[in-house]
Amino acid sequence: MRIDVLTLFPEMFTGPLEYSIIKRARQAGVVKVHLVNFRDWARDKHHTVDDTPFGGGPGMVLKPEPVFDAVEALRSSQEAAGPLIYLSPKGEPLTQRLVKDLAALPALTLLCGRYEGLDQRVVDHLVDREVSVGDYVLSGGEPAAIVVLDAVVRLLPGALGDDQSTEDESFNDGLLEYPQYTRPAEFRGWNVPEVLLSGHHEAIRRWRKEMSVNVTRKNRPDLLRGQDDIIAGGHS
């Protein structure tokens, strides 16, 4: 998979790209990540990428020309640049289902905003999808792009040592993940549930499903709406 990232601050990605799963996936050729500073497409000698908003108001707005020129240059240089995803608090929520859809693509382009956002003409005529990583505002789209990068890359075949690792995680079946335990079996008087030590795989499966339902009901009850079949599979 190829992922292009359009940003004014490519140095913010240096750390995340050089550690853990993303680093290993890049080294293995599972994913190629290209950082593009769209300031390089600014049209004046000062490399200006923003200007004051029409109609007044605080802050600065990213100009359309550098973004359009950078994206069009990117698209003309390769057969498939993939859809352009703009990271924005106004976008649709990033969900595991959306992450799976993105991970199935051969290519993807992430656009990081700054300041008061993008000129709306970029959103209307260039962006394929606006995506938000949560109901809060960040200083720029770079942290959100890193979230998308990590979530997508770890789903790519060969990115994890054990592809089974992603199958039992939160949201994969509409539920949050069940509790996990490891050695020692007893710690400060707190014991690991006996069923996990029993070796009875069906009993363990049922316990995990029940715990998933309970955790979801406690922390994300919205996920259970209209999921009577899932709730029936776990008993509180």
Question: What is the predicted role of each segment?
Answer:
Residues M1-L74, L197, H201-R225, H235:
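N-terminal nucleotide/polyanion-binding subdomain common to many enzyme families
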Residues D4-L6, H34-V36, I85, L108-T109, ...:
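Hydrophobic/aromatic beta-strand patches that form the interior of the parallel beta-sheet core
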Residues L8, F38, L87-K90, C112-Y115, ...:
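Fold-independent oxyanion-binding glycine-rich loops
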Residues S20-R24, K100-A104, L126:
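Short, solvent-exposed amphipathic alpha-helical segments in soluble enzyme
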Residues P58-V61, P93, Y115, D119, ...:
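Gly/Ser/Thr-rich beta-alpha loop segments that engage phosphate groups in nucleotides
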Residues K63-R114, Q120:
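S-adenosyl-L-methionine/SAH cofactor-binding core of RNA-modifying enzymes
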Residues L118, V122-E169:
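Structured adenosyl-cofactor binding patch, chiefly the S-adenosyl-L-methionine
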Residues P143, L155-E194:
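Internal, active-site/partner-interface "lid" segment
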